Each structure stands twice: as C-alpha cells, then as structure tokens.
C-alpha cells in the first residue's frame, strides 16, 4: 500500500515499509505466540504497542497459521462493552473468510444478536452486535472463549489498554473470571497490552492478583536513534527529498524517542519539504509552531479545567521537562510551589486523570506537545 506521507500517525498498522525497527521485540512476540506463552506488553501511550502487534500479526509465520484478533478497550466501561467489542472484532475478521464462519460464531455465541448493514461510506458489509434480552455478559464471554477454542486454526487475541478492566464495576471478579478462562485455553494465545505501568504491574506482578506470573513480560522502550535516523532519512530519500541528520537527532532528543510525537513532527516536516529540498533545524521550529497553532485552543481549555495550584505545578513540570524529586526543596523553591503537601494534593488528581505520568524515575506531563506549549507560553 502506497501512502502520500510515510510518517504514519494513526495507530492502525499499514505495512512493514512504514514500520520502524522493533526487530527484537517482534521476534520475542512471535516466539511467545508460537510457543504458547501469553504476553503482557507494557509501554507508555503512543509508543507503538498497537503498531507492533499489527506488524507481528502481518508476518507470514503468524498470518498464515493463526486467526488474529485485536481490540482496544480504552473507551469501554463494562464487561458488556468488552464482550460486544470482542465479538464484533471476531465477526468482522471472519467475514473475509466466508459467511459460514460468522454463522458458526453466532450459533456458538447465542447470547448476542447480530444485525447486518452496509457501511454508508465504503459500502462494505457491517456487523452490529447487541446482547439478547435474556443474556448475561459473563455467559457471552464464556461462549466466545468456547468458539475460539473450537477454531480449526489456533487463535491469538490482543487486548490493548487491558488495565481498563480494573475500573469496571466488579472489576476484580471479572479479572478473576478472565484468568480462569484464559488458563483453560489450549487453542488461544493472548497478548495483554497496557500503557499504565503501575496498574499493569499491579495486575500481573502482585502475588494476590489472579494474573500473577501468568504471562511473559515485554516492555517497549524508545526505538534506537540510529535505527530511527535511517528510517526517517530513508523515507525522505525515497521521495526525492533530503533531511539533515542534526534535524532527526534534535527531534529525537526533544521527545526522548517517543514514537508518536516524533512521527507527528516528521509528518509535518515531510509535508512542508518539496522534492529536491532539504529539511533542517528551521523546519522543526516551523512544524512545532504550526502544531502549537492547531492545538492552541485545546491546550488553553485544558489549563482552564485545573485549579491554580495544579496549573502552577504543570508549569513547573513543563519547565523542567521531567522531575525526579517532585516534592524536593530545590524544585519547590525554584518555582515557588509552597509546600510538599500542597504539591501532593495538586499532583494526585493530575496523575489520576493522566495529565501527569509517573514514570520509573520521574514525573512528566503526559502530552509532550502540551508540555512544550506550556514551557513556551509561561
């Protein structure tokens, strides 16, 4: 598939041509699947989890031997949402292989009702699932697992933002039920992906939790600078354009190798660079200035939603980029933040709503563009 801009910023996997590196992680994930090791995949949001999963699912050793299913449950709030999302994904994936497989699914999962229609834009057939009047989400989940286990080909199910289940009503009970179903599977392998390191760690590394030590961990860090440099310069060259190496290094450093933010900037730089031209450091300034203009009202509204104490803390964190000792005397005095207890009070809700992320050794504003915008404006 040929695209106009090689720097993809959607989470949907396109092809290996537009996928950078991750050779080691891909090999590990393929090995886990082929050797029936369930995987817990953890990284920051927008670091490339779904892209990695899509890439692995497209490899010949997986695509030719396995049925693969992927759902992102970030927007789900209940087991009903989860079940219908998984059921819809299975139906849509099976559609391309014939009506009989879809019919088999609907016969096995009798607790859901399907309606069929044509997509008004693409004209492709679309499936909508709803729970039957007498069904329960728990029963539907059991029936879906039964269907997966009866498949003629082994199945792989990837669930992104898995930690969301912990926030469901009766989340602990649902997680325990899932663990019981998963451990009894002989024909289905699972990838549990998540971006909240603390919650994923609690679910999979705490002895009292059902999923404790049940999966092989895989952590997704930044792509190496040399690999990403080759990726960026290669796409510019293939399209009759050039880019200075220093330009790539600067963007990489600015975002600490965080994939999506780099991709977004280079998407803009690529668009602004005509064939025969060379992108340089000025290209970065122009691209980021344009990004600030686009998100100006969004960022202003985000600041309006926080208290004055929270705003002061956000400004301080943005100025530092990342803060190791957020309640330390030096940080407090540098930005006139009053007391450590006041910081803790302001920090707690910002972490809960994911405005600030607590990493292994520091705190930082989750949205890197928001952080840069604050640092420049204040």
Regions found by a protein language model. Give the residues of each.
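Amphipathic alpha-helical "lid/sensor" segments that cap RecA-like P-loop NTPase cores
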Residues: 233-297, 308, 360
């Amino acid at each position: 598939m040929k695209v106009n801009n090689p720097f993809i910023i959607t989470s949907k996997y396109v092809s290996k041509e537009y996928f950078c590196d991750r050779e080691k992680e891909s090999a590990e994930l393929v090995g886990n699947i082929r050797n029936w090791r369930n995987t817990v995949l953890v990284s920051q949001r927008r670091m490339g989890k779904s892209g990695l999963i899509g890439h692995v699912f497209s490899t010949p050793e997986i695509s030719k031997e396995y049925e693969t299913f992927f759902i992102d449950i970030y927007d789900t709030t209940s087991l009903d949402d989860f079940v219908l999302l998984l059921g819809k994904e299975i139906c849509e994936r099976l559609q391309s292989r014939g009506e009989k497989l879809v019919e088999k699914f609907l016969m096995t999962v009798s607790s859901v009702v399907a309606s069929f229609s044509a997509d008004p834009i693409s004209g492709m057939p679309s499936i909508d699932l709803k729970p039957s009047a007498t069904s329960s989400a728990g029963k539907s989940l059991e029936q879906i697992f039964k269907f997966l286990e009866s498949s003629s080909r082994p199945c792989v199910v990837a669930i992104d933002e898995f930690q969301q289940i912990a926030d469901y009503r009766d989340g602990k009970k649902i997680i325990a039920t899932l663990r019981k179903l998963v451990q009894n599977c002989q024909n289905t392998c699972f990838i549990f992906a998540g971006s909240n390191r603390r919650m994923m760690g609690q679910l999979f590394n705490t002895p009292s939790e059902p999923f404790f030590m049940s999966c092989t961990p895989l952590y997704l860090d930044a792509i190496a600078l040399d690999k990403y440099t080759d990726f960026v310069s290669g796409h510019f060259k293939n399209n009759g354009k050039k880019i200075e190496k220093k330009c790539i290094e600067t963007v990489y450093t600015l975002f600490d190798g965080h994939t999506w933010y780099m991709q977004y900037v280079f998407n803009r730089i690529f668009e602004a660079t005509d064939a025969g031209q060379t992108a340089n450091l000025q290209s970065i300034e122009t691209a980021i200035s344009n990004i600030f203009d686009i998100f100006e009202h969004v960022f202003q509204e985000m600041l309006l939603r926080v208290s004055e104490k929270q705003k002061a803390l956000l400004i301080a964190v943005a100025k530092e980029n990342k803060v190791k000792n957020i309640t330390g005397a030096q940080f407090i005095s540098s930005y006139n933040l009053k007391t450590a207890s006041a910081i803790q009070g302001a920090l707690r809700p910002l972490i809960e709503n994911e405005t600030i992320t607590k990493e292994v050794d520091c705190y930082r504003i989750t949205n890197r563009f928001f952080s840069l915008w604050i640092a420049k404006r204040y």
